[in-house]
Structures are given as C-alpha cells and as structure tokens.
Amino acid sequence: MHDAQIRVAIAGAGGRMGRQLIQAALQMEGVALGAALEREGSSLVGSDAGELAGAGKAGVAVQSSLTAVKDDFDVLIDFTRPEGTLNHLAFCREHGKGMVIGTTGFDDAGKQAIRDAAQEIAIVFAANFSVGVNVLLKLLEKAAKVMGDYTDIEIIEAHHRHKVDAPSGTALAMGEAIAGALNKDLKECAVYSREGHTGERVPGTIGFATVRAGDIVGEHTAMFADIGERIEITHKASSRMTFANGAVRSALWLKDKKNGLFDMRDVLDLNSL
C-alpha cells in the first residue's frame, strides 16, 4: 500500500451514501481520495467527485471501471448492492486491493465469497459502521448473557422508504450478537413476521419488526421484556456521516493488514472489552 496515505476508491459515488463517503475521505487525515466510481452509462461519469459530493473540486473524475483506476487506490469502500459488490470483490481479490464492505442483503453464497476472498486480501465487512451501533452490539451481548434466558427478546428497526432489504443488516447483526451470547443459532430462533392467529409467543425466540417510512436514517431497538419490567437498548442515527466516517476509519485501519476478515468491532478494539 501507499506509504504516505491510504488511498480509497468509493463505489456508488453518486448515491446518498457514496457522496457522504467522498466527503469523509476528503476530510479524514491520513486518507486520500484516489478514485470514485459509478455504473457504466451514468451521466455522472466524468464529473469531479468532490463537486458531486458538495465538497468542492477534488481533482478526481468519476469513472465507470475499476480497471481504469486500479493503480489509483489501495482500498475500495463499497456500499452498493450485493451483485455489484461481489463483482468488485473479485477484482480486488485479483489485484490485491483491500475492501471495506457496507453492502447488506447478501445470501449465504455471497457471504462465503467474502470469507474466501479474505484469505488473500484484507476486508472489513460490517452491517453498520457507526461507532454507536457497534457499542450497542457489545452491550447486547452483555445484556443477553444476564437476561436473555428469562425474557422475551424483540428487535425493532426503522429506515427510510428507499431501503430495499428487510430486516436491516444491523437488525440481523443485533440478533446474531444476542443469539451468539446465548449459544443459539439465529436461523433457528428468529421470527421475522407475525400475521393472523399466531398463537402465544414461543419461548426462546427472537422477534423482528420492520418499519419503512419517510427519510428515517436508521433506528434500532432491542427489547428484553419480562413480567413487570423491560429493558430497551436503542440507537438512532440522524446523519449518514456517522456511517461514512466509520467506513473511512476502517479503510485507514486496514493500511497494514495483508489479509483477513474483520468487522467494525475489530477496528474499534471492542472485542477486547
């Protein structure tokens, strides 16, 4: 990797998250914006990435091909769609580039492809790059170990009307954190929908509820409910910049990593707590 700075490329540069990532990359010390990418045929190709993000001229033109910029970046930051991310993953694996993956909605095969690639390149793969959310995940592990076997656990998440996957990747990560703390498999204890005559709640399950409305950036609550009391642990995001800053921070953290699969808790050293 480049000696002086980590050079990042931003996939999906013209999207809501892409523009925030460009701003974060331009602002963070030790990071240089090396490339910005949009899909082939986009009217944004050729435009200045900094101006696109509202951050002023950056001197980096938006491109439609990773091949065209393969010598301009060390780490690709990708918050796009699973099919696009997996194509980018294959390129980065072939050319020895690190990746920060914030894309959600992968199936099991997609997740396995990421694990396989991490044997050769360094990857930070997380459902949520907010510092607060990752502290939340740690708190959920602690709460589950104390209360999980005695309470009804529900996870409620809300996002903007444009989000295409449900439950959110963060909600699933919350479920995984709780299930893992209880030595359970989330696939076997999760309840993703309730409709009609459902009967009484099945003990030991983890319920999920989803809201899609307006411009909600992201809200997540885990509820541990007993008779007479309940604990709710909530995170609310008010700006995508919290995710963008975390993703760029992750790219910087990867600077000296050759290979391996990491998440945001590794970046923040939360696993040592």
Swiss-Prot record:
Disulfide feature: none
Assembly, per entry: Homotetramer.
Binding site for NAD(+): 12-17, 38, 102-104, 126-129
Stored CDD domains: DHDPR_N
GO BP terms: diaminopimelate biosynthetic process; lysine biosynthetic process via diaminopimelate
Active-site residues, record numbering mapped to chain: 159, 163
Protein known as: 4-hydroxy-tetrahydrodipicolinate reductase
GO MF term list: 4-hydroxy-tetrahydrodipicolinate reductase; NAD binding; NADP binding; oxidoreductase activity, acting on CH or CH2 groups, NAD or NADP as acceptor
GO terms for cellular component: cytosol
PANTHER family in the cross-refs: 4-HYDROXY-TETRAHYDRODIPICOLINATE REDUCTASE 1, CHLOROPLASTIC-RELATED, DIHYDRODIPICOLINATE REDUCTASE
Pathway(s) annotated for this protein in UniProt: Amino-acid biosynthesis; L-lysine biosynthesis via DAP pathway; (S)-tetrahydrodipicolinate from L-aspartate: step 4/4
Key words of the record: Amino-acid biosynthesis, Cytoplasm, Diaminopimelate biosynthesis, Lysine biosynthesis, NAD, NADP, Oxidoreductase
Coiled coil regions in record: none
E.C. number: 1.17.1.8
Role according to the record: Catalyzes the conversion of 4-hydroxy-tetrahydrodipicolinate (HTPA) to tetrahydrodipicolinate.
Subcellular location: Cytoplasm
Main location: cytoplasm
UniProt record similarity statement: Belongs to the DapB family.
Binding site residues for NADP(+): 39
